[in-house]
Amino acid sequence: MNIAAVFNALLVSVLATVLWKYIKLREHAFMVEEELVLMRQSQELSQVQIDYHAALQTLLEDGTRMVCTGRMHTDRICRFESLCYSTEAEEFIYFHSNSSVMLPNLGSRRFQPALLDLSSVEDHNTQYFNFVELPAAALKFMPKPVFVPDVALIANRFNPDNLMHVFHDDLLPIYYTMQQFTDLDPETRLFFMEGWSEGVHFDLYKLLSNKQPLLREQLKTLGRLLCFTKSYVGLSKITTWYQYGFVQPQGPKANILVSGNEIRQFTKFMMQKLNVSLEESSSEEYIVVFSRTINRLILNEAELILALAQEFQMKTITVSLEEHSFSDIVRLISNASMLVSMHGAQLVMSLFLPRGATVVELFPYAINPEHYTPYKTLATLPGMDLQYIAWQNTAREDTVTYPDRPWDQGGIAHLDKAEQERIIKSTEVPRHLCCRNPEWLFRAYQDTKVDIPSLIHVIRQTVKSKPGPKKKWSGSLYPGKVRDARCQASVQGTSEARLSVSWQVPWNLKYLKVREVKYEVWIQEQGENTYMPYILSHQNHTFSENIKPFTIYLVWIRCIFNKNLLGPFADVLLCST
């Protein structure tokens, strides 16, 4: 064999080995560099350090893990580990591995209609959340993930340009969702996935966390595939008190679960974040008139302010969202004796009023106050301790309408002439569904000259003296069960019997200041469907009416504080005559 050929073959083999090692080293260096870039992207999200290789290995081996609370999509909140999001497909991804957990495991029921609601507005088809499923092995063929090391709360804002929606649908539910799960502390990062821009009230969302909230559009700048190491998806609806009329005309929710106490805990938190202190405020009592500057105007606002000041002998000031900072408005409202405003989103600020203050809501012509009650419902929540008054303009001549404006500002020029005539002549907007009823919009955006004597008369029916806040909490505490309930029967002949029942007061009564204590007793003959109810003032009573000899009776007893605070029934007594 030619020695030169052997030498060349060896040289080629050595060069190939060196070249292969160089390529492998370069690939490894490229992968390390890519991991460093992805790690830096992850750390741009947070100061939390992350071991990128370990995080990627965990995702490949363990996949996604999900455990949810709630039985239905309308009350479900889910906790995820390693939930991912494709910014290109704009969809969440659940990666399956042998270690994945999915509870509840709904199968195709997950699409009927969704796993959960992303917002606190119940069962709205623009607010549904779901994910796409992939095997964890698919990660090898996908863009390298950027890991989000912060604990994430993922939700939708419903309408961030409207202050009522901001507080009712977003801020309160986010605040109490974070109270519900200990992982959701002030270092949680909020991710809003509905697609809106920041909006005029975005600074309020920033108060809920020490970290800047991120919007869906911003996620595209972070990477093509984001993976949340730990996240919670969905919002608690427990603080919401109003439904907006998507299925039936708007009104209070059927089962309201929030009280004024929880609202006031939230407002206390917000005031602290806004650096608003009641101690900084003047002790002088005053009335606040909320001024609107674009639509739904009070045409004789100056006259109204003067009349209120004279009637109640109190300083009267105006505030507006356009001319005052939010913290200044909160500072003024939080110490006011009365808040007067046209119907509108700004009235949600009444949740900052002190206990004992008065809310006066003004309604334009043809708008029935009983049909639009978000602020009445708020003011009358148990424990809010606010007085609510509604006034409606009933004089057609005191209203200014704008039929030629665009439809979304109350214009009706796009409607046929007959419909325009009907709306103009109508004296009351019929109950309707949300959100584009032209008659409602026409009346909602009209301006009003307030009949001041009429308004003062309506206020005076509720506010008999000078209005003023009360600082002390007058909580509604419920009685416990009555104790040691006993019964004793006596029979007189074959046709008459008596049933003597006695009990001890609930043990918590001795710690409470209660104006009035009553007891409710139900007596039911065994086997019958009806019962005889009694309201009693004492802890014992002998019953003879409708009591029969040689009969078994079931007796229930409960305590009532102040006429309407009903305690639980004690265990049923079985009494034989």
UniProtKB/Swiss-Prot annotation:
Domain of life: Eukaryota
Ranges of the Lumenal topological domain: 26-577
Any one Gene Ontology BP term: protein O-linked glycosylation
Parts of the chain on the Cytoplasmic side: 1-4
Pathway, per record: Protein modification; protein glycosylation
Major enzyme class: transferase
MF GO annotations: acetylglucosaminyltransferase activity; protein O-acetylglucosaminyltransferase activity
Glycosylation (residues): N98, N275, N335, N540
Keywords: Endoplasmic reticulum, Glycoprotein, Glycosyltransferase, Membrane, Signal-anchor, Transferase, Transmembrane, Transmembrane helix
Catalytic activity: 3-O-(alpha-D-mannosyl)-L-threonyl-[protein] + UDP-N-acetyl-alpha-D-glucosamine = 3-O-(N-acetyl-beta-D-glucosaminyl-(1->4)-alpha-D-mannosyl)-L-threonyl-[protein] + UDP + H(+)
Cellular localization per UniProt: Endoplasmic reticulum membrane
Function summary: O-linked mannose beta-1,4-N-acetylglucosaminyltransferase that transfers UDP-N-acetyl-D-glucosamine to the 4-position of the mannose to generate N-acetyl-D-glucosamine-beta-1,4-O-D-mannosylprotein. Involved in the biosynthesis of the phosphorylated O-mannosyl trisaccharide (N-acetylgalactosamine-beta-3-N-acetylglucosamine-beta-4-(phosphate-6-)mannose), a carbohydrate structure present in alpha-dystroglycan (DAG1), which is required for binding laminin G-like domain-containing extracellular proteins with high affinity.
PANTHER family (alphabetical): GLYCOSYLTRANSFERASE, PROTEIN O-LINKED-MANNOSE BETA-1,4-N-ACETYLGLUCOSAMINYLTRANSFERASE 2
Protein name, as recorded: Protein O-linked-mannose beta-1,4-N-acetylglucosaminyltransferase 2
Organism: Gallus gallus (Chicken)
Gene field: POMGNT2
